Amino acid sequence: LHDPCDNTEDCEDGLECNRNKCLIPYDSDKTCETGWDCVHGVWCSSFPGGSPGCRMDYRCKNEQCEDPATECVDEICGRKEGERCIGPCKAGLTCRNGYCRKPW
């Protein structure tokens, strides 16, 4: 995990080369510890009684987001300013008091 790579063949079985690192793909059976273990735009999450996995997909589909409260930036559907942090905030914003806001 996190080994440098040029393509997926450089990674151990079950991992994907993403942004030049071997990472866990979306909906894999592999266990993650943090979101940094998952491919770009996918979050590590766990359900009660289950092991953590790369199960929350926030990647844009064809550069579009289904949720109008989000905007596609850097291939991720990020929550807009003033929206609740129920997913990643748009680039340049941070989650503060439960809402996506500009940094201090």
UniProtKB/Swiss-Prot annotation:
Q: What is known of its domains?
A: The cysteine framework is C-C-C-C-C-C-C-C-C-C-C-C-C-C-C-C.
Chief location of this protein within or outside the cell:
secreted
Coiled-coil stretches are none
> Which species is the source of this protein?
Iotyrris cingulifera
PTM note: Contains 8 disulfide bonds.
A cellular component term from Gene Ontology for this protein is: extracellular region
Job of this protein:
Acts as a neurotoxin by inhibiting an ion channel.
Q: Spell out the protein name for this chain.
A: Turripeptide OL55-like
- Keywords, sorted A to Z: Disulfide bond, Ion channel impairing toxin, Neurotoxin, Secreted, Toxin
> Where does the UniProt annotation locate this protein?
Secreted
Tissues where the protein occurs: Expressed by the venom duct.
Keyword Kinase in annotation: no
Q: Name one GO molecular function term.
A: ion channel regulator activity
